[in-house]
Amino acid sequence: MSRWRVFARCRREFVFHYLSARGGWDPEMPEVLQDIYRYKHFYPIDLHVLDIIKSSFFRASGKYWHGRQDEYRRSFLRFAKSDAAVLVRELAGLACIRDPYGIRSVLEIENEGMDFDTAAAEIYARTEKAALLFIENYGNLFCEHTPLDWIGTQNIISFSCEDVTIYLPRGAAWIKNGRAGWLDIGLYGADTASAPGSEEWRRYWLFRKYGVEPGRADIAFYDIFSGESFTRNIMDFDFTGAKEIMFRQAVIMREWVREAVQTGFDIMETKPEEGTDCRKCRFRNFCRKMEA
């Protein structure tokens, strides 16, 4: 649960990201909330590139590529380069890097002082590298499946399982000959074997919805920059135990928020968990500003 991971890592980030300015942009809201809203829209270059690779993937998913591997590879690379160019044009069109209306700005410009031209060059270079790696590793994926094999996972999916709503992030999922596959495209680093196993049960229950038996569903965690992937077979899962853990986490977060509101304590008095790398946090400069 990403919200729980943020809560455990840093209470400040939890409050800023999930609780402050959550109603969207309002020019009448206090200046401090306007700042928080702006900072929420800073994303590192790697996340921008991840979005581009996923977008290119889904743009290709509606076409029939069987027997046309070379054409698919050319199209995928063209999609990726086109999306990178669109992103750079959008960023260049901002009146300033901290425009309040939410084109996701570049974190390195804010935190590291990177100039815009360098950021744009990095977006292009990393996109091309990631696209070529993906083509090398999964270039035949669409050529092995027809559009009818794919499960619609271009957008976040939610569905009910018992009394719990399950949310699935975007990913590529397919069912063919009674087996299910899921390609989780992400930023896992070279050690993809350490990819979060806690995510598996979400996919498993989706596959169960489509009648796939335990042991006949595989999930591959793929890192877009190293080109490494790690595949797990999704067996049956103790959903009741997972649900209890999720509920306990929700109670802990809710009680902490309630106590914080009642006592009116200053969130800036809290400190990140030891070992947290604040250099990668979108709110780093905001914290510095508040601590000054």
Report residues per predicted region:
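A non-catalytic, helix-rich entry segment at domain boundaries
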Residues: 52-147
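Mg2+/Mn2+-dependent nuclease catalytic core
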Residues: 147-246
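Nuclease catalytic cores
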Residues: 4-93
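Metal-dependent nuclease catalytic regions and adjoining charged, substrate-binding loops involved
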Residues: 206-292
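Well-ordered, non-membrane alpha-helical segments in soluble/globular domains
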Residues: 122-136, 196-204, 243-250
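Glycine- and acidic
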Residues: 35-42, 182-189, 267
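Short, compositionally biased low-complexity segments
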Residues: 19-33, 77-111, 175-179, 215-227
